[in-house]
């Protein structure tokens, strides 16, 4: 999956026929990223789209090297409690739909946002109810970036609509913060069953990236949330954010530590035993003293 190619196509930036595919692993990332940017012909003057394209390439330049060491030195990620009024950092309301991912590496839970990403949630919930994800394995692990799955035995994704994909859904109320549950879009800007969780570190948003978000017109509240919790703003408006992990992020971090092969697939399979749905139950209020 090439996140950069997906984003730029969705952004109205035209990809030249001979543009190279951008890769994240290995020292070739710098060469590919530079070649990719030079191969794009920008259409229009949307500063946010331009920022996202350049920021993604810059992030890949920084993160492209050293992937072969992944899994060698497990680390514990300390994640802060982010104080923000942004939707993804507010506690789920009682009755909200929650997806429970039971994997061989542990369990994590994500609250879904059908009001903001209706098609993504409808498709995901429908596939969960059919048991589609049960028994699948994690197929994409990029430490400090994303953990993904959702491809069937044929290596492809599917939908509840007979395989017909749905267009990616965007909103300024959902972003690629650490822990975001996202539907991956293809080069045509369409999504299916493949999903990923953003696994970036809390300090992943540099001052330079912050300055670029400001210049691109991001809301101050969004920038502050990115600064506090980390994330991948260069993926915004490319893929669909439809949920947020609120419990078990340590499991996602554990999966991200796995040793991977040249395709970023775990050497030792990590199985999704099941994905199930439940309704969030708010903690009972403490009795008055």
Where are these regions (language model features)?
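Exposed boundary/loop context
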Residues: 5, 11, 16-19, 28, ...
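Hydrophobic alpha-helical membrane context
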Residues: 21-22, 60-61, 151
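Sec-dependent N-terminal signal peptides of Gram-positive bacterial secreted proteins and lipoproteins
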Residues: 49-67
């Amino acid at each position: 999956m090439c996140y950069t190619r997906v984003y730029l196509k969705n952004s109205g930036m035209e990809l030249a026929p001979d543009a190279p595919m951008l890769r994240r692993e290995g020292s070739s990332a710098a060469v590919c990223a530079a070649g990719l940017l030079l191969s794009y012909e920008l259409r229009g003057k949307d500063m946010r789209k331009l920022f996202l394209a350049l920021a993604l390439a810059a992030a890949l330049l920084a993160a492209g090297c050293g992937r072969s060491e992944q899994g060698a030195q497990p680390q514990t990620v300390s994640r802060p409690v982010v104080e923000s009024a942004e939707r993804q950092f507010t506690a789920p309301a009682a009755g909200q739909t929650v997806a429970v991912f039971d994997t061989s590496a542990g369990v994590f839970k994500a609250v879904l946002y059908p009001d903001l990403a209706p098609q993504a949630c409808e498709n995901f919930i429908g596939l969960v109810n059919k048991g589609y994800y049960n028994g699948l394995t994690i197929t994409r692990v990029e430490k400090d970036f994303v953990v993904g799955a959702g491809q069937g035995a044929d290596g492809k994704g599917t939908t509840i609509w007979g395989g017909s994909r749905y267009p990616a859904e965007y909103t300024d109320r959902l972003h690629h913060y650490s822990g975001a549950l996202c539907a991956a879009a293809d080069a045509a800007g369409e999504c299916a069953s493949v999903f990923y969780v953003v696994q970036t570190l809390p300090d992943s948003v540099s001052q330079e990236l912050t300055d670029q978000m400001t210049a691109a017109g991001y809301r101050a509240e969004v920038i502050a949330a990115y600064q506090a919790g980390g994330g991948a703003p260069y993926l915004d408006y490319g893929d669909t954010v439809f949920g947020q992990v609120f419990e078990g992020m340590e499991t996602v971090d554990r999966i991200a530590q796995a040793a991977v092969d040249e395709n970023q697939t775990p050497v030792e399979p990590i199985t999704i035993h099941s994905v199930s749905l439940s309704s969030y139950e708010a903690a009972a209020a403490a009795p008055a003293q």
